[in-house]
């Protein structure tokens, strides 16, 4: 019986890992491939005009948007949920949108978040995600992919 229980735990972990990998797959249909997150504006204004300036833009975008923003937000979200402070999650949503300077990036984040919510709720029963969707619909929060992913 112990062997069967061990196999069950291993399969459960494998299934959870497969689910995470699916959600993180670049081909997952959340629409993020449709958004340049402000890069088109930089191209139009000749801020990005060669491989070097593009590389610099990617480096800055990753360091300032994804690592120090989205990654930190997810960590803060986990801490808030561990402490039972769901209201803190909604504050984090507002902070993420407020600190996103480029309008294109803010709009893209909202669109990707709404698509993520729809697909995730089609696949999983996540009560906090349902609450988040209602708050977005009632314009209490904006909607951000980092919050969706964290929830």
Which residues make up each language-model segment?
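Glycine/small-residue-rich interface belts in oligomeric ring/scaffold proteins
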Residues: 19-86
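Membrane-interface "cap" regions at the ends of multi-pass membrane proteins
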Residues: 11-18
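Internal, conserved structured core segments that host functional sites
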Residues: 71-72, 76, 85-151
């Amino acid at each position: 019986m112990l062997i069967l229980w061990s196999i069950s735990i291993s399969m459960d972990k494998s299934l959870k890992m497969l689910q995470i990998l699916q959600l993180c797959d670049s081909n997952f249909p959340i629409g993020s491939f449709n958004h340049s997150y402000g890069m088109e504006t930089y191209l139009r204004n000749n801020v990005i005009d060669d491989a070097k300036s593009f590389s610099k833009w990617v480096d800055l975008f990753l360091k300032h948007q994804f690592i120090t923003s989205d990654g930190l937000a997810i960590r803060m979200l986990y801490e808030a949920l561990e402490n039972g402070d769901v209201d803190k999650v909604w504050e984090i949503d507002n902070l993420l949108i407020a600190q996103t300077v480029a309008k294109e990036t803010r709009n893209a984040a909202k669109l990707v978040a709404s698509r993520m919510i729809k697909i995730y709720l089609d696949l999983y029963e996540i009560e906090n995600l349902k609450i988040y969707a209602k708050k977005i619909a009632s314009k209490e929060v904006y909607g951000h992919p980092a919050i969706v992913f964290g929830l």
